[in-house]
């Protein structure tokens, strides 16, 4: 389980933004908010970022979405409960995602807590859930993996992933 203090989470968010901007991407806050910040949802902290890699003016939208939910784990302690990191390339019409959610259900059904989605044609998955190997270690890792997929300039080969069902 990944744990952090509030100060570590503030630094972490700054690191994620800095990483994306270093690659020339634009980082946008969710839901037309004025700033990018952690949002509180009950006893959870939530990160929701839209990252737009640099594309030409006539290109269609490319977006990397980075979402995390951290739950309270003690005095000034948080643990990563869920994540969803997604690349949607509307120019090449594919989607790639790294997820961790509904952990108990996934462990019970598939024996793993994390999984991937791969759609070589967006909206047409060859498999509902694929094994995330290795599991994603957070938003920086998720961003690096998905940005690398986008930089390749080709659709991902989803047949190389092990289908969970």
Regions found by a protein language model. Give the residues of each.
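An exposed acidic His-Trp-rich patch
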Residues: 77-141
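Short, solvent-exposed beta-strand/turn "edge" segments of beta-rich domains on protein surfaces
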Residues: 71-77
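Short amphipathic alpha-helical "recognition" segments used for binding
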Residues: 72, 120-123, 159, 164
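UBC/E2-like fold recognition across ubiquitin and ubiquitin-like conjugation systems
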Residues: 1-65, 133, 137, 143-165
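Short, flexible loop/turn elements at secondary-structure junctions
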Residues: 51-55, 68-70, 87-89, 105
């Amino acid at each position: 389980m990944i744990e952090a203090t509030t100060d570590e989470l503030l630094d972490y968010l700054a690191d994620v933004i800095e990483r994306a901007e270093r690659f020339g991407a634009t980082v946008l806050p969710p839901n037309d908010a004025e700033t990018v910040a952690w949002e509180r949802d009950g006893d959870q902290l939530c990160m929701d970022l839209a990252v737009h890699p640099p594309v030409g003016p006539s290109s269609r939208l490319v977006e990397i979405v980075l979402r995390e939910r951290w739950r309270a784990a003690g005095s000034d302690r948080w643990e990563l409960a869920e994540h969803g990191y997604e690349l949607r390339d509307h120019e090449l019409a594919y989607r790639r995602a790294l997820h961790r959610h509904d952990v108990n259900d996934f462990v019970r059904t598939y024996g793993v807590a994390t999984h991937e989605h791969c759609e070589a044609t967006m909206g047409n998955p060859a498999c509902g859930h694929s094994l995330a190997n290795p599991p994603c270690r957070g938003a920086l890792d998720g961003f690096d993996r998905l940005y690398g997929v986008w930089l390749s300039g080709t659709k991902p080969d989803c047949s190389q992933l092990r289908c969970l069902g």
